[in-house]
Amino acid sequence: MNRLLIFAIILFSLSATAQRNPFANLTEKNGKIGIGTTTPDELLTVKGKIHTQEVLVDLEGAVAPDYVFETYYNGFSEMMPEYSLISLEELEAFLKENYHLPNVPSAETMRTEGISLKEMNLILLQKIEELTLYTLQQQKEIDALKEKISEK
């Protein structure tokens, strides 16, 4: 009798699961799709984690930070005329005052507004390029100091 009862419970559970609507978590409102939300605010809004193998982000309208090297080596960038690499002293002063890198949103801004992957990836690439230039400058200084020492 116990086995029959257990079998009936399992059978009922399986049939109830099979009858669930697999799209119950989807919402469409004003041409916008929501997954896990009833109030989508973009073309596709997902509330929760997304598991994917790859994400492709179009850079339409964005300027890749090649302007960092262009400005450094040419003294000017046609891609981004207003860009200039700040000195390490200026950078340190900015950090002491703001507690984050220039052109990088503050923790508070990220918390309240979120981040755009396209924008943040471009900012981070700019910072990597700037760090590369600072490192190259420091290496030149190290090499010059080594040469001075070896001359003595």
Residue spans of the language-model regions?
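Short, positively charged
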Residues: 63-109
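C-terminal trimerization/auto-chaperone modules of long, extracellular attachment fibers and adhesins
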Residues: 19-82, 150
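Alpha-helix boundary/capping residues
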Residues: 11, 95-98, 127
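C-terminal intramolecular chaperone/auto-processing assembly modules
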Residues: 109-152
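Short glycine-/small-residue-rich flexible loop motifs, especially phosphate/cofactor-binding loops
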Residues: 41, 92, 125
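Bacterial Sec-dependent N-terminal signal peptides
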Residues: 1-24, 91
